[in-house]
Amino acid sequence: DISDTKATRRFGELLGVVFDAEPIGELGGTDGALAAAGDEAWVALQIERKHNHPVENLLQYWPWLERSRRRLVLVHAIAPDARRRTGPRAELTCWVGSMMERVLPGRFAYCRVELGSDGEAAQVAAARAAVEALRQPLEGRSLLGGA
């Protein structure tokens, strides 16, 4: 079990960002962190430990994005000991992430990372690609990294 501080530092190193931005309203608060990644561009890290209703941690960003022209990559880190890493709630969270990507094209990317899983390395690589795409100039940039 890694602490939130260690997990935040580790993800910052993996993604090439520093999670030191002040929370924006209630975003990036106790369950996560924010990093500035450019002009009106942010990387958010949400660490999911309980996994009771993970979709709530995702949905909190939607109104924030709707009210502005901000761009965001959300890295949703699911702890190894989180309950129900698979199942209907996990599937709903992934579906809502995909829906937000469609409704907010070029402005939002959802990157789920299941810590300690066989797919973790590929998931981190996809998140890193999304962060790099976020840093590119707005014209000619795909937030989804060619996906």
Specify the residue positions occupied by each region the protein language model found:
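Catalytic cores of nucleic-acid endonucleases
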Residues: 50-99
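Catalytic centers of nucleases
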Residues: 23-37
